[in-house]
């Protein structure tokens, strides 16, 4: 049983997560999220902690940000777009139990103090921007670090806000490069 309450978008997501783990869950109802649901999430966060696991698309990211702006200290779990896509449908409900377990094991909590550990120079040096393969490298690295896929500026923010260390980052880069050999 997972200690934290897992927050997902809908009932189909709950079904998929239940196939992977035993946990208490809250479905926000997509963009229908309201103050009652936010109150439930706040109470769960105080009581046992919360992990947000939304779809790997624009709408999922908007819902994640909405929750994060209203409930402090939640952890974030991410599945890749590849893991969440079945035919032309994208969502947590399409992810295999193994992908959901991996995402939950890598769940990260945002740190309070602002860090400047990573910047654009790191992105350029490690070919995470301004390179033909940068999008794919960011996606693979984001999954390995448990911070999900996003554009370069958001990637820098997540590296800093989720407390990723240079050591973790370098190890993940080396593993990524070994896998590409």
Swiss-Prot record:
Protein's recorded name: Ribonuclease M5
Broad class of where this protein is predominantly found: cytoplasm
Alphabetical UniProt keywords: Cytoplasm, Endonuclease, Hydrolase, Magnesium, Metal-binding, Nuclease, Ribosome biogenesis, RNA-binding, rRNA processing, rRNA-binding
Protein family per UniProt: Belongs to the ribonuclease M5 family.
Positions contributing to Mg(2+) 1 binding: 9, 55
Upper classification of the organism: Bacteria, Bacillati, Bacillota, Clostridia, Eubacteriales
Pfam families (UniProt xref): DUF4093, Toprim
Example GO BP: rRNA processing
Keyword Nucleotide-binding: no
SMART domains (UniProt xref): TOPRIM (SM00493)
Subcellular location: Cytoplasm
Cofactor binding summary note: Binds two Mg(2+) per subunit.
PANTHER family (alphabetical): RIBONUCLEASE M5
Domain Toprim stretches: 3-86
Cofactor(s), names only, from the UniProt record: Mg(2+)
């Amino acid at each position: 049983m997972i200690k934290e309450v897992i927050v997902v978008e809908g009932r189909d997501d709950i079904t998929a997560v239940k196939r992977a783990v035993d946990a208490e869950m809250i479905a926000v109802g997509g963009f229908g999220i309201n103050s009652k649901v936010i109150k439930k999430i706040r109470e769960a966060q105080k009581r046992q902690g919360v992990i947000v696991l939304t779809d790997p698309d624009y709408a999922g990211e908007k819902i994640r940000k909405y929750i994060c702006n209203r409930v402090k200290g939640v952890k974030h779990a991410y599945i890749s777009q590849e893991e969440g896509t079945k035919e032309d449908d994208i969502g947590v409900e399409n992810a295999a139990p193994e992908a959901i377990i991996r995402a939950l094991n890598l769940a990260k909590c945002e740190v309070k103090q602002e860090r400047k550990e990573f910047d654009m120079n790191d992105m350029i040096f490690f070919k995470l921007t301004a390179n033909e393969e940068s999008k794919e490298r960011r996606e693979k690295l984001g999954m390995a670090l448990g911070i999900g896929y996003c554009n370069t500026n958001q990637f820098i923010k997540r590296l800093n806000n989720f407390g990723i260390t240079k050591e973790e980052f370098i190890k993940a880069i080396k593993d990524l490069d070994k896998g590409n050999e």
